[in-house]
Amino acid sequence: MDPLHIGHVRLIKAAQKLGDELIIILNNDNWLKDKKGFVFMPQRERKEMLESICGVDRVVFTDHQPGEYFKDRSVCRLLKKIRPHIFANGGDRKPDGDPVPEVALCEKLGIEIIYNVGEGGKVQSSSWLLAKVAQANRKS
């Protein structure tokens, strides 16, 4: 969720309908720096924006440390701590052949995983948006 976009809003609105409380697990700046090499929007700003969406009860950061992305990019530690009834995933996640650690943990803890939450699958991407900005900057 860096930057936030309409796909995230649709995911959140759909996820609200799945339960009584909506907790968003937000990848922290360390995770983003390891994955992309930079942070576009600082975690505090992303958190504040998410908290301003009606129906979001809580936003929690992952506790990834610098360099940890390549060892553990999952949100398993927080799933163990929060113990939600449902783990909702957006339009870019697949139920088939997706050997992510969250699947095994959710099965073990009895957490239901719901895929493709939101309208219309993957309608936007943070990476796509950043690529458009980079392309526009190259042209100017």
Predicted regions and their residues:
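Nucleotidyltransferase catalytic core that binds NTPs
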Residues: 1-140
